[in-house]
UniProtKB/Swiss-Prot annotation:
PROSITE patterns given in the database record: P_GLUCOSE_ISOMERASE_1, P_GLUCOSE_ISOMERASE_2, P_GLUCOSE_ISOMERASE_3
Signal peptide residues on this chain, from the entry's feature table: none
Enzyme class (EC, first level): isomerase
One GO-annotated biological process of the protein: glucose 6-phosphate metabolic process
UniProt organism field: Thiobacillus denitrificans (strain ATCC 25259 / T1)
Pathways involved: Carbohydrate biosynthesis; gluconeogenesis; Carbohydrate degradation; glycolysis; D-glyceraldehyde 3-phosphate and glycerone phosphate from D-glucose: step 2/4
Name of the encoding gene: pgi1
Enzyme Commission numbers on file: 5.3.1.9
Name the record gives this protein: Glucose-6-phosphate isomerase 1
Amino acid sequence: MKPLKTLPAWKALEQHFKSMRNFDMRAAFREDAARFETLSLRCGNLLLDYSKNRVTQETMRHLAQLARESELEEMRNAMCTGERINFTEKRAVLHVALRAPVRPALMVEGVDVEREIAKVLHRMQRFVESVHNGSWRGHTGKPIRNVVNIGIGGSDLGPAMVCHALDHYAVENVRVHFVSNLDPSHLAGTLAQLDPETTLFIVASKTFTTLETLANANSAKAWLLAALRAPEAVARHFVALSTNAQAVEAFGIDPENMFIFWDWVGGRYSLWSAIGLSIALQIGWGNFQALLAGAHAMDVHFKEAPLEANMPVILGMLGIWYANFWGTDTYGVFPYDQRLRLLVPFLQQLDMESNGKNVNRANKLVNYNTGPIVWGAPGTNGQHAFFELVHQGTRLIPTDFLVAAVNLTPLADQHEWLLANCLAQTEALLKGKSRAVIEAELIAQGMTRDDARALAPHKVFPGNRPSNTLLYQKLDPHTLGMLIALYEHKVFVQGVIWQINSFDQWGVELGKQLAPPIRAALSSVRVIGEHDGSTQGLIADIRRRRGLST
């Protein structure tokens, strides 16, 4: 593996960037009537318009060449054939296999991948259908009406995002809720709405040792037992998504009601596995299969389309262009679709936990920027919160806008305004508004020339600010599957270019190691352990507030 900055394509991009410093997208559109057609791409019903970027066709050729020299195609094939590309944990990365309708024969760690996936999916389907048709009943014989998914990180963010996004497709009589935070108000607020006799809990923890998940699960069990007063009730009101049968059984869950997943499925890529049980319970098995099919359609596109016409590659390489040549630190994601209100938190984990790394595959510190800060909110809420910064701030912020052509509610006029606002924002970012135009408008409105000159600079929109637009027909399960897989593969592309491991997450470990002694120090008779001055001071203040000695 050659160092990234020594690759010929990288050096060519450095030279090309010098000629692009003053590139004006407005002029590019004036000079090229076909720019939209040239710099847009379709996959199924999904349209990516990337023409509003500071790129030319030459830029895109250089970026595709960088992908080739970085051996992106080889790494993509290695992932899909079960090689251990998660090299720090010596694991394969096979979330793509979970959504393939026909899986090639593949053995990983002595496990027949196709057979194992098929077996778990079959068990999931039977369970989902038993809840929906009423044959699975609670301890007192009542059917299940509410499901509470207890998990954190990938066991929560993905399923919660999908369930909110596809709420229009929810089955009747079963509602799914999500609890993740260790803060007791999260669980208490959820349980306050529910009837223990008709509530099912899903405990999602691969090891069945995750602190936050087990704390919430034990509290939920205590709530259930306080109401039903029968220890055997746990078996009818709890199921587990785990690999630790012994711990699951000790909790009181029948191991027959444990759905497994594997080390080659990372948490932030796990909604396609048994972790997606809550999704299937919310939208039904057929719609869950449509979600998988949409993701598979994007997988096929990613594996087969040439780099120059490959949607995840284009999105990923545009991110490289801005982060490593234009010096951007963030990118904004703005879904003009309220159902996608949890997409940004999901993408924050997907992107920042995957590519927030500073050591490369050669175990060396990198000398370039890697994962960006991901942020955003649904439109039009974001317009009234932070778009001032995007339009008029001092930082260049690449952005993604997502919007459906057709809404699923009867309020069609509101959707027309939503669509109009989405397109207007991307146009405003591109075109901007000059001081001369603003002065003329102010004078025409009756303002004096001097006052107009004084106010105009504050109303200037510089324009020439980049954005991508992802347009889809409607937000159905298949389309959502495509969108999620698109961003998964985009993150993979960038990790390959940056020569980092996108599939481990060591950054979460240190805080977890430091928490137990701090917890002990907060409530013990005497302060235990040594801490830095700031942490020691905070512990002492908490102890004083609790009436403990310091």
